Amino acid sequence: LYSSVKDALQQFPLQIHFQMNIILAKPRGFCAGVTRAIETVEKALAKFGPPIYVRHEIVHNKFVVESLRKKGAIFVDEVDQIPVGAITIFSAHGVSDRVEEDSLARGLDVIDATCPLVSKVHREAKKYEEENYEIILIGHKGHPEVEGTSGRVKKDVILVTDENDARTVEIKHPEKIAYVTQTTLSVDDTKKIVEILEKRFPQIQLGLATKDICYATQNRQDAVRSLSKMVDILLVIGAKNSSNSNRLRDLGEECGLPSYLINGGSNVDPRWFENIKTIGLTAGASAPEVLVQDVVNKIKEISKSEVVVSDMDGITENTFFALPKKVRK
């Protein structure tokens, strides 16, 4: 009997089949505002020729910035680094009134690539100022978008960064206050902050707590929540200075997953995948799809098993923003 079983096994060797799954979040990657900003630089380069100056990174992604730099874009920190009269593009994050005034004083030919949803927050803040509200800005200190929004009103804006700030912030006129937010915040964190403010200041001008958080930020966070139920680990493609990418990584951790923020395939560590069957992969709003494929290829390269890639069910985004007039055909 033993010899017959042995012969059978030799004739039909036992094959143990392992499979690793990668589930791609949907939606992921570029949002309409990022697409518009990048296309603005590319169209300006094509229409006017290099160099084209850009104040700050056009979007928070080194891969995108380097690709545009190779085409002739020059990125600077402040407008006083730009030659008088040069073509200048403002980044998707928006700028303050002071930056606009300094640009005008230097005679710069400005093309504004500010995301329209950020511009909407600017208008909202100005409206509150005109109506004599004390303004709270919920956001991250030092973020370009926060600096731009706070610099759009002449009175001091009160920055609230977290729940502790919301509990301790002092308001001179609690009978007339309003709030605006950065567009790339955590939806859940923002709701908690607004709830605290509402309890402390019942007369605060209220709207939907997440009224200023952009559609793409909400959609990508919702996708990660759904994805977290299907995977053992989460990889988020995005830059360290990308607010929305960091929030996706944080959300993955809150959902109980080992979660890593990476720039691309070169950051993938094989040790992350020990005893892992299913990998969740998403990308922040400034990360191009080519980096998603780069990470997938890296996982396939280091995997000792077959890798099957699929997209999760999710919404299809159809939002589109027209380009600035100066770069339209």
Where are the language model's segments positioned?
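Cationic, low-complexity basic patches in intrinsically disordered or flexible, solvent-exposed regions
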Residues: Q11-F12
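The feature marks the mature, well-folded catalytic cores of soluble enzymes
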Residues: F18-A283, E289-K329
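Acidic, Ala/Val/Gly-enriched low-complexity intrinsically disordered segments
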Residues: V5-A8
